[in-house]
């Protein structure tokens, strides 16, 4: 009998594998366990507000360095390309970049350098190109609908640096080259010498322009187009709830964007109550009277505030075009109905417990005895990637001319 589970990959695309890796990573981090199965709706709202961004992105600089590395490869002579594929070159240069940035900012307390903790002889565990590829496509920095692997395979080493075509471009009559699909502020073959994690003025202006011309109803595009980016960054909006309050009070943004933020915040608040009851159930099962008292007080405060009803839940699902797995959609409807009708906590706890067990089955936290010092389990109020987006937008804003 096997004592250890193993995972194998079906080779669909790098995005498919990255999505699974993200899930595995999240399961090892506090506050990300999706015990109630609402992650798809959370991600649906995040994709509307912050398309292309993810929770594992760190700094804006990688939106520049990845296309620079690809452009460097495309500038090589065909003979040099035949000796090394774009995939090999990209991996090599991204590892060199990690070392260069780490040395450049040594002992400066700089955060967000991918690969800064790797030791001699090691490689970056998660290359920036895989982390930022969707963002590069979404914001028009690299013009392609191909996955990262498809794009890398499409640039054949034996071809001219100006002659490589992508799978989705095969029928283009004008023969668009891979080189012309890479957009940058300027070509700088010496860019890696003295590279910094911060953006130059030219790079910041370029990314600022890309955000302005990105998905029109996304929050980054609206903040750029309305001239409100500096204002939102100057505010102490560290959490999504604070951001939602600011957006509600700011008429300069498109109504569709404001509506999306409002719906996302309402969803976060409604489902926070369910996660609160879930933690009360867990605390009761584990005889944690200290946590039980604490969470019951939080519940009393939460329950005083009016929450979204079933009609709003239907609007959320329509707006995000999300189909929730299993009976999660029914659970959301029933939860909102019960809250609107002030149903007893006995019924609420039974509903939450049923959903958790139906979602996770034998893997549910409810089936496990937890350590004596455990704290909050699973999700709390949702952030929708705002923390990561805020850092990247701040990088861009700080690089712009005064």
Region spans (language model):
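Non-catalytic recognition/regulatory regions in large multidomain proteins
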Residues: 1-402
